[in-house]
């Protein structure tokens, strides 16, 4: 399938991408140009991106950094907390023939095959900022499709107001699920239905021009760029529509530290980290955190 890139007012120019090697490992911070080869991307339609809205809001541009660094530093709590090592453990996750169960307040519960979804929806590239609650920030080029396209197909009932997402429960593979058995596994997250239908909310199946590797949440994950990264659940196996706020992993363990909305906000300290500033790979000085991670023009109307 040809790669389709739909220009939007929130898009970043390519030179702001944090190469994959920094995103995952964040140890060396080198400024280079990220290059997509025809062999890596296949048959693509390349379109120059327009001005990125967050830049107008005062977010300074991020230099390119090599993809090789970003492939070795990541958060995937199911596989442990050693960010520079868990990518190895994540390779045990078998992602072939992956399915997603759909239930709750939906007209017809069903089982979705991810490979079919990838063929069904036009593939887009979305270059998004990703802001971790640990106060670091990167820029990632995702491949996938808007979540709203899937929601429209699933036909939720009028009473549905929220969407709950769940990941796998495989304690023999994801050892944190076994070693920290008292925690409320599997990992879950949720959005309001309005948030889930927003054009920015994305289901990613690829990154840096290739399919998602296991440590990034293969074969399909959520990306919600104006919220802290823990909202962007990885390796989704279930989607439920509900009429009540779903109980999610971190909020169920520590509701005073992790609120359900989890919108990026520089004036609200979050969990164990102050949020006024953020670390950006490749820069020595911290940057000021921007409300909604630079996407205020697009999402602020949802939070009066």
Indicate where each model-derived feature is located.
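A broad "ordered helical/assembly scaffold" signature
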Residues: 3-4, 22-23, 28, 34-35, ...
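Structured, non-membrane catalytic/scaffold regions adjacent to prosthetic-group chemistry
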Residues: 52-304
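N-terminal secretory signal peptides
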Residues: 1-28, 49-52
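N-terminal export signals
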Residues: 28-51, 222
């Amino acid at each position: 399938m040809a790669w389709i890139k739909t220009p939007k007012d929130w898009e970043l120019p390519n030179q702001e991408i944090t190469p994959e090697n920094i995103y995952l490992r964040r140890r060396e911070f080198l400024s280079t140009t990220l290059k997509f080869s025809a062999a890596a991307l296949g048959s693509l339609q390349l379109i120059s991106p327009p001005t990125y809205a967050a830049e107008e809001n005062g977010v300074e541009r991020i230099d390119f950094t090599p993809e090789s660094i970003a492939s070795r530093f990541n958060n995937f709590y199911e596989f442990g907390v050693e960010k520079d090592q868990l990518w190895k453990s994540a390779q045990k996750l078998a992602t072939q023939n992956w399915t997603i169960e759909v239930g709750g307040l939906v007209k017809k519960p069903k089982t979705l095959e991810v490979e079919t979804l990838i063929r069904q929806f036009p593939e887009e590239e979305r270059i998004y900022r990703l802001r971790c609650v640990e106060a670091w920030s990167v820029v990632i080029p995702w491949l996938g499709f808007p979540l709203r396209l899937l929601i429209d197909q699933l036909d939720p009932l009028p009473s549905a107001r929220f969407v709950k997402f769940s990941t796998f429960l495989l304690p023999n593979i994801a050892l944190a699920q076994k070693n920290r058995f008292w925690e409320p596994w599997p990992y879950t997250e949720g959005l309001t239905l309005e948030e889930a239908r927003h054009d920015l909310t994305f289901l990613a199946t690829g990154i840096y021009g290739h399919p998602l590797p296991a440590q990034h949440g293969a074969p399909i994950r959520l990306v919600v760029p104006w919220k802290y990264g823990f909202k962007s659940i990885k390796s989704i196996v279930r989607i439920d529509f509900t009429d009540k706020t779903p109980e999610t992993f971190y909020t169920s363990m520590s509701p005073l530290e992790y609120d359900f909305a989890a919108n990026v906000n520089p004036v609200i300290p979050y969990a164990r980290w102050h949020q006024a500033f953020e670390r950006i790979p490749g820069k020595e000085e911290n940057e000021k955190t921007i409300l909604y991670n630079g996407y205020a023009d697009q999402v602020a109307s949802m939070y009066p």
